[in-house]
A protein has these predicted regions:
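Sec-dependent signal peptide recognition
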Residues: 2-9
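Exposed boundary/loop context
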Residues: 10-11, 31
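C-terminal motif of bacterial Sec signal peptides marking the signal peptidase cleavage site
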Residues: 14-17
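Calycin-type beta-barrel ligand-binding domains and close structural analogs
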Residues: 19-35, 43-55, 59-179
Length: 179
């Protein structure tokens, strides 16, 4: 059970660790994808049924923005997200907005992450942008875009998949929300 908890914490850190100081795509132009909305529960490989599962709650904030909450019974992290496309690759740009302790600190620099996603059979697979290919140390959006373009055909541009299953519509209110 301790190993499962460590895996759960590791998955939480992978999904929520903000990697970049600047966004890959700064503006939200694409309309939201309604099929992403709702509550998603993690699908761990070796779950024993004892530990709480993480939940990913995706709500519509505007025509182009999502409000995203990720966590388990003990802690949550909050993002705003928007769909983007670059080099023919569709992804979601995430910006960390806070956690259970409140909004992000003005001193925090790494507020942005980039994830790809696939939907099918009631499951959502989320993959993180590979920071071995697109360095966390790039300091502006243009440099990030150049590195992204240079690796666009690399099969591990997005890696470390996390799987989630869709829960019923009533589940959107299961997690406490911060307003």
């Amino acid at each position: 059970m301790r190993i499962l908890r460590l895996i759960t914490v590791f998955t939480f850190l992978i999904l929520t660790a903000c990697d970049f100081n600047v966004p890959l795509v700064a503006k939200a132009f694409l309309p939201i994808d309604q099929t992403l909305l709702g509550t998603w529960e993690s699908i761990p490989e070796d779950w024993d049924g004892q530990e709480p599962l993480e939940r990913l709650v995706i709500r519509q904030q505007s025509a182009n923005l999502y409000e995203i909450e990720f966590g388990d019974e003990a802690s949550h992290i909050y993002f705003k997200g928007w769909l983007a496309e670059l080099e023919g690759i569709r992804f979601m740009q995430l910006e960390c907005t806070g956690d259970d302790k409140g909004p992000v600190d003005a001193k925090d620099k790494r507020l942005f992450s980039v994830v790809s996603f696939t939907l099918g059979n009631g499951e959502l697979v989320v993959r993180s942008l590979n920071t071995d290919l697109v360095s966390r140390d790039l300091v502006n959006t243009a440099a990030l875009q150049v590195a992204f373009a240079a690796n666009r055909d690399n099969p591990i541009l997005f890696h470390k998949p996390d799987q989630f299953r869709r829960l019923g519509e009533r589940s959107v209110d299961d997690l406490e929300t911060r307003k």
